[in-house]
Swiss-Prot record:
Lineage: Eukaryota, Viridiplantae, Streptophyta, Embryophyta, Tracheophyta
Pfam family, one: PPR_3
InterPro entries in UniProt: Pentatricopeptide_rpt, TPR-like_helical_dom_sf
Organism per entry: Arabidopsis thaliana (Mouse-ear cress)
Stretches the record annotates as Disordered: 1-84
Keyword vocabulary terms for this entry: Repeat
Amino acid composition bias (Basic and acidic residues), ranges on this chain: 59-70
Similarity annotation: Belongs to the PPR family. P subfamily.
Annotated Polar residues bias: 38-56
Protein name (database record): Pentatricopeptide repeat-containing protein At4g20740
Length: 727
């Protein structure tokens, strides 16, 4: 019997309404999601903006400017917070609670974290794995893993161990991850092959070849035999990281286990043998591959050729090419291109051109890069006509020459004195809306100077200025290029004198010319440029003063060189290594031992990689504390083994060390041994012995004066009429 209906209720049956999920956020009602971090979502108030006509602002496409080698910028990766929030939405509530407990305590394990976790009735292995997959702190992850394992009746499963291994590797603790198999075994869950595979894959992806072999050895100790796939992974990691002998040892184990090679196995070995240059063994492996499995395909042969070309072994790559033809494998464009580029870079442009003609005969699409490499090869061989013919072929094939091809042909034309044609090509490059650089213009500029067409050279400079290129930078690079050839130094000076009248002088150009004249031995002319630079109002920089230091030392004016060194220090700059070497040499010649050692220490303190003789000078000083001639000679022997020349600085270091810590007798023993070995001449021995005596006298006098001042005897000596202290 139906119960009576309550009063005041409509006849229509009640239908309950359930709200599923979060409400839709609006401008006034944000929605808060719980998770790793509070995610307060609200819709911002967007001011209405007039829609612009996108077609009006779109840049028209110009096929002439299109370059197939350019790529669109990759899409920006999602931010870290986005990744974390997305991952937290997939977490179970308990895993989210655990991660929130870590976050509240700033990822520091302690009693507060343990008290939070103890609120949970139980943490299952799946929860442990879920938490460790997002863990970014190895210490907290290890503590949590250990805490979970102490639960009553709890036992980690394979997923938890695997997640722990990934967490340790992700945070750089891969050595600790390698100990997980022992941990699993001690906790009553022996590892399976999968755990070792994970460790091997992690090390292989991070290019840790020796670690891969270490895990492989551990795998054998646990009694596991890898499958073919895992063997391939191990050998590939060892080959890629340069441990080919270990890869061969693993291959021997592979054969002892009675496994059958796959094509991947053969290719790993072949590529390793190619890298090691063991071509005969590689050909034997290829023959076994043909007999036992199948012939290598075009991709396998291309990989071999690419490996050999990258190692610079072109003879072996041609042998592999012959093997490919013997197997009746048709090369593709990648195989042709790899070999042609390698041959041209190795100077075998004729052989590369033969392969190029084969490609044309087979109607294979030829890349512009192949044209460019062939043109550069012909220019390097002096076959400019062939390079120009190839350019015509390039244009007929529908390509537009890039700036690299222009640079190569311009350089070739200038080498055969066709500088006018080269200049026309430069103008064509500008009309084609390319961007010529110094590499384009330098052959033209040098050719005009060599042919003594200085007016045309000036016109080129004006054209450079009109195009908006930095004339001063181009001139600096030009003089560097010209002064690199000693025969063209005189031409460089002639050009400079003309440019100077047109206001194109600069400190950098003066420095280049000063250094060139110094290397030629024309010290006076180099210094005259230095004085001229100052007279014209240019402020010398540290390089200018460094070159002047070298010049003054060669001239014999060490005092002036020292004054320039002080100016460099006042500028808060560092002299060049050449200036340090030159100044120490000059100070050695006038017997300023302390100043030499001071400069040695200053140089090694200021310069990133100082001269080896300076480093050994400090070593000699340190060894002299033992006052043992044999120890000093051991350092000298080490210098000879390292190929370091024993010069004045080392002699000064011996004098400085022995005058402070040793005796004159021990120093003479060292000099006598150096003379016996014909390292030091008899005249040098006499000079340095005198320096040794003088330096010892100085140090003895310094000790006496220090003692007088320490005991307060100065006033008594002056009262008795002693005037030595005044001097």
């Amino acid at each position: 019997m139906k119960s009576p209906k309550p009063p005041n209720l409509s006849d229509k049956s009640l239908k309950p309404n359930f709200f599923h999920g979060h409400r839709k956020p609006s401008q006034n009602r944000p929605t808060v999601y719980g998770g790793l971090f509070s995610n307060r979502q609200s819709i911002p108030r967007v001011s209405p903006q007039p829609q612009s006509n996108s077609l009006a602002h779109r840049t028209p496409f110009d096929l002439r400017k299109w370059d197939p080698e350019t790529h669109l910028p990759p899409p920006s990766p999602p931010s870290h917070s986005t990744v974390i929030s997305a991952a937290s939405e997939r977490l179970s509530p308990i895993a989210r609670f655990v991660l929130d407990a870590f976050r509240k305590n700033r990822n520091h394990w302690g009693p507060s974290v343990v008290s939070e976790l103890n609120k949970l009735r139980r943490v299952t292995p799946s929860i442990v794995a879920e938490v460790l997959k997002l863990g970014n702190d190895a210490a907290v992850a290890a503590k949590f893993f250990h805490w979970a394992g102490k639960q009553k009746g709890y036992k980690h499963d394979f997923a938890a161990y695997n997640a722990f291994a990934y967490c340790l590797n992700r945070n750089g603790h891969f050595r600790a991850a390698d100990q997980l198999p022992e941990l699993m075994d001690s906790q009553g869950r022996p590892p399976s092959e999968k755990q070792f595979e994970i460790l091997i894959r992690m090390h292989a992806d991070n290019r840790r070849g020796l670690r891969v072999y270490y895990v492989y050895e551990k795998m054998k100790k646990f009694g596991f035999k890898p499958r073919v796939f895992l063997y391939n992974r191990i050998m590939d990691a060892l080959v890629k990281n340069g441990y080919f002998d270990l890869a061969l040892a693993v291959y021997e184990d592979f054969k002892e286990d009675g496994l059958v090679e796959e094509s991947t196995t053969f290719m790993i070995l072949v590529k390793g043998l190619c890298k090691a240059g063991r071509i005969e063994e590689m050909l034997e492996i290829l023959q076994r591959m043909r007999e036992n499995l199948c012939k290598p395909d075009v991709f396998a042969y291309t990989a071999m050729i690419k490996t050999l070309v990258s190692e610079g072994n072109l003879d072996a790559s041609l042998r592999v090419w012959d093997e490919m033809r013997r197997d009746e494998i048709k090369p593709d464009v990648m195989a042709y291109g790899t070999l042609v580029v390698g041959l041209c870079k190795d100077g075998r442009v004729e052989r590369g051109y033969e392969l190029f003609m084969e490609m044309k005969g087979k109607q294979i699409l030829i890349d512009r890069e192949i044209y460019r490499v062939l043109i550069e090869g012909f220019v390097a061989d002096g076959k400019v006509r062939s390079a120009c013919n190839l350019w015509e072929d390039l244009v007929d094939s529908g390509y537009i020459a890039d700036i690299g091809i222009y640079n190569a042909v311009i350089k070739g034309l200038c080498s055969v004195n066709q500088v006018d044609k080269a200049y026309k090509l430069f103008q064509v490059a500008i009309e084609e809306e390319l961007e010529p650089d110094f590499e384009t213009l330098s052959p033209i500029m040098v050719a005009y100077v060599v042919m003594n067409r200085l007016s045309d050279f000036s016109n080129v400079l004006e054209r450079i200025g009109e195009l908006g290129y930095p004339v001063s930078d181009y001139l600096t690079q030009f003089f560097k290029l010209l002064c690199a050839d000693e025969e063209k130094n005189a031409m460089a000076l002639d050009v400079f004198y003309i440019l100077k009248t047109k206001g194109h002088g600069s400190v950098s150009v003066y420095n280049i010319l000063m250094e060139a004249l110094y290397k030629m031995g024309d010290i006076q002319k180099s210094l005259s440029l230095f004085y001229e630079m100052r007279k014209l109002g240019f402020e010398p920089d540290s390089s200018s003063y460094s070159i002047a230091i070298c010049c003054f030392v060669e001239k014999g004016d060490v005092k002036a060189a020292c004054s320039f060194h002080e100016k460099i220090i006042e500028m808060s700059c560092v002299p060049s290594i050449a200036a340090y070497l030159s100044l120490t040499k000059g100070l050695c010649q006038i017997g300023e031992i302390d100043a030499v050692m001071l400069l040695v220490r200053e140089c090694l303190g200021n310069v990133e990689s100082g001269p080896m003789e300076f480093k050994y000078a400090l070593t000699v000083c340190h060894v002299c504390k033992g006052s043992n001639a044999e120890k000093v000679m051991k350092v000298v022997d080490e210098m000879n083994q390292e190929g370091v020349f024993i010069n004045e600085v080392i002699y000064c270091a011996i004098i400085s060390g022995m005058s402070k810590h040793g005796t004159i007798k021990v120093a003479r023993e060292v000099f006598t041994e150096l003379k016996k070995r014909k390292v030091m001449t008899e005249a040098d021995m006499v000079v340095y012995e005198e320096m040794l005596i003088e330096q010892t006298k100085k140090k003895t006098a310094d000790l006496v004066l220090s003692g007088i001042k320490f005991f307060g005897l100065e006033s008594k000596l002056r009262a008795k009429g002693c005037r030595l202290l005044d001097n």
